[in-house]
């Protein structure tokens, strides 16, 4: 992935 873990965590949160 090209996104850092922080972004992934945020996406998971909003998902």
UniProtKB/Swiss-Prot annotation:
It catalyses: (R)-prunasin + H2O = mandelonitrile + D-glucose. Keywords: Glycoprotein, Glycosidase, Hydrolase. Transmembrane segments: none annotated. It is an enzyme of class 3 (hydrolase). The keyword DNA damage does not apply. GO terms for molecular function: prunasin beta-glucosidase activity. Glycosylated. Its EC number is 3.2.1.118. Monomer. This is Prunasin beta-glucosidase 2B.
């Amino acid at each position: 992935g090209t996104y850092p873990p922080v972004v992934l965590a945020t996406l998971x949160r909003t998902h």
